[in-house]
């Protein structure tokens, strides 16, 4: 079953076109890794998919519900605000810089939106939040504030906060890029666990070994185009496109691919 589709999306900033007719479909339980150089359009695609950026043209579908479609003039028209609020509940987004509420404790970061946006019962929400805190290895940190936590701990809180909304799928935008190398592993471990639990995920990442081991499908982007797409053992370990080979050559010899 398809959970998410983005079809023929185009996006420009002024005279610069950053996405050229991009189409991606993600099935339930699938893990898709998006790789590519800086400026390739990876994060812009994620921001369009999560409606943080508007598309110039294209179609956006979650669970067969159209969040956006092309109007007769070929421009993107979005669903009503009420429909978009509901559709946005289908996914969670984890940023590279955590984006936690600095004046909220760990517990309140997790419970604020489920209680006040989803209007769920506080006792139920707090029970689920405590379980997520345990799952993320953050027991005893419930009343800590973000500035009292390491970067890796803050990112685990951000993942738990996204999961607290009970989304159907998660988007990750370079979840380890703001972390020291020794903290990267703990975040990748959490994402691996989510993959084993069949959480549907789209992950923009520069961790090639991780993408190879965890993703069901890898998309390589460059210059706002999808250059190559397929199984990780094909795209990462045996790419067919010359541009993909050039990009991945930067990682050879670092243990990133052949670890």
Give, region by region, the residue ranges found by the protein language model.
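A short, proline-enriched helix->beta-strand linker immediately N-terminal to the Walker B motif
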Residues: 164-168
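Conserved ABC ATPase signature
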Residues: 145-149, 153
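Conserved ABC transporter NBD signature motif
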Residues: 58-73
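Catalytic Walker B motif of ABC-type/P-loop ATPase nucleotide-binding domains
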Residues: 170-173
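Helix-to-loop junction immediately C-terminal to a conserved catalytic motif
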Residues: 50
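ABC ATPase "signature
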Residues: 229-230
């Amino acid at each position: 079953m398809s959970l998410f589709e983005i079809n023929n999306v185009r996006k420009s900033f002024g005279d610069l076109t950053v996405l050229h007719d991009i189409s991606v479909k993600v099935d339930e339980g699938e893990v898709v890794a998006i790789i590519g150089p800086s400026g390739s359009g990876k994060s812009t695609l994620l921001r369009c998919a999560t409606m943080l950026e508007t598309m110039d043209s294209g179609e956006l579908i979650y669970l067969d519900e159209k969040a956006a479609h092309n109007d007769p003039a070929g421009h993107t028209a979005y669903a009503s605000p009420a429909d978009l609020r509901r559709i946005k509940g289908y996914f969670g987004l984890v940023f590279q810089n955590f984006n936690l509420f600095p004046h909220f404790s760990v517990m309140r970061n997790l419970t604020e939106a489920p209680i006040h946006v989803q209007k769920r019962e506080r006792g139920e929400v707090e029970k689920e939040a405590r379980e997520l805190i345990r799952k993320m290895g953050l027991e005893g940190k419930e009343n800590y504030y973000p500035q009292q936590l390491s970067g890796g701990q803050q990112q685990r809180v951000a993942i738990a906060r996204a999961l607290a909304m009970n989304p159907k799928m998660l988007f990750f935008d370079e979840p380890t890029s703001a972390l020291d190398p020794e903290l990267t592993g703990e975040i990748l471990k959490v994402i691996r666990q989510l993959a084993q639990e069949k959480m549907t995920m789209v992950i923009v990442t520069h961790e090639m070994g991780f993408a190879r081991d965890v993703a069901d499908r890898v998309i390589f982007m460059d210059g706002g185009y999808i250059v190559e797409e397929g199984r990780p053992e094909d795209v990462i370990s045996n790419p067919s496109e010359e541009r993909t080979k050039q990009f991945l050559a930067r990682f050879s010899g670092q243990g990133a691919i052949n670890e």
